[in-house]
Amino acid sequence: MYKTKCLREKLVLFLKIFFPILIYQFANYSASFVDTAMTGQYNTMDLAGVSMATSIWNPFFTFLTGIVSALVPIIGHHLGRGKKEEVASDFYQFIYLALGLSVVLLGLVVFLAPPVLNHIGLEAPVAAVAVRYLWFLSIGIIPLLLFSVIRSLLDSLGLTKLSMYLMLLLLPLNSGFNYLLIFGAFGVPELGGAGAGLGTSLAYWVLLGISILVLFKQEKLKALHLEKRIPLNMDKIKEGVRLGLPIGGTVFAEVAIFSVVGLIMAKFSSLIIASHQSAMNFSSLMYAFPMSISSAMAIVVSYEVGAKQFDDAKTYIGLGRWTALIFAAFTLSFLYIFRGNVASLYGNDPEFIDLTARFLTYSLFFQLADTFAAPLQGILRGYKDTVIPFYLGLVGYWGVTLPVAMVFDSLTDFGAYSYWIGLIISLIVSGVLYRWRLTVIMKRFESRKA
């Protein structure tokens, strides 16, 4: 990050930060995309099992990665104030925090996931695949969270290209391991859908090893003196948790409601479960666009707010939201035109392709709502405003989705689509609430400037 003097310089800097994050996010979401698509090519039953497993995994994992992402605004404020010497200390505290959170998530996966999956009415083979997938995926919990901390450090320093290059390694690693383990190639045991979980875990262990080497060899990072290990500092840990818990909670509130809907799909046929998850999986991949805008906004806004350049922060807000709208126009057009082709990536059965294409039509409205709501979340994080947005997210996601979905399911013949309608309306409501909160926060900072 560096100070800019005019709109053109701000646009150039914003795009320099945004595009590597976008590619990074695509690579990040590609792990789930590859797991789902390759399992779908194996068979529909295993795809349904992986779908149910990810419905349990995603909320908890995104909750914890949301917590460690608090490192971005913390370092952003340090840099804005010219206190670069504080960076290494906060980095190490978040490493310790990530290790502790890994143990928590491991316990949840091992002890809670199997009972849940075995008592929601799944067909026995589907439940068996889901349990094995989660157990294999849990092997990669530690590298997943530690890499999230390293990535947050690099992003907050403006080294988003480095994050991008590292994350681009994930796709070939994950695809290669998945091919071996799902289909049993070259004499490797054939694990089916469960092998996708092990493939992802192995890919992240390799990625973590490479990231650590880069961290200590990168010339731009040597000034931080990361080679000097800094002991545990409970005050900084508490600050990180205080800021990160609402961020993680907000992400959890959003992802968990999607997962609950995924679990509710268990009452429908395996074909509907597989089609729902395939459409949701591709929607998550497309979410990389607004999510990247959100991450870039958190970086640039936190820097300008830390430097008390509130007018510059406001300029970045406008740039970010216009960028989100422009990209949305392209992604929505692409998905509408090629929704049938996208559906065929996940399976060959004509009925499956037709049903998945219908779900993808509903996902167009997801993306439109996310274009409005997601950048606002990043902006609020840049202002270090995380607690109130957490409660707003709870109201928007949990207070709207299920009531609306159940009304549609009971009073109409929309069936499984009722729950997608509930999700769409909840995203719109959440976006309106976040916009109201941003107006309040910006007025508060404007009054301080005066």
Model-inferred region functions:
Residues 16-35, 136, 203-207, 211, ...:
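Transmembrane helical elements of multi-pass membrane transporters/channels
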Residues 26-48, 117-124, 180-191, 252-285, ...:
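Helix-terminus/linker motif at the lipid-water interface of multi-pass membrane proteins
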Residues 9-37, 41-42, 58-70, 74, ...:
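N-terminal transmembrane alpha-helices
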Residues 47-107, 111, 144-158, 162-163, ...:
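Small-residue-rich hydrophobic transmembrane alpha-helices
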Residues 68, 137-155, 163-174, 196-212, ...:
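Short runs within selected transmembrane alpha-helices of multi-pass transporters and secretion channels
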Residues 109, 178, 182, 211-215, ...:
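Structural signal for membrane-spanning alpha-helices in multi-pass inner-membrane proteins
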Residues 21, 25, 36-37, 73, ...:
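Transmembrane alpha-helix boundary and packing residues in multipass membrane permease domains
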Residues 1-21, 75-142, 188-245, 301-366, ...:
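Short alpha-helical transmembrane segments in multi-pass integral membrane proteins
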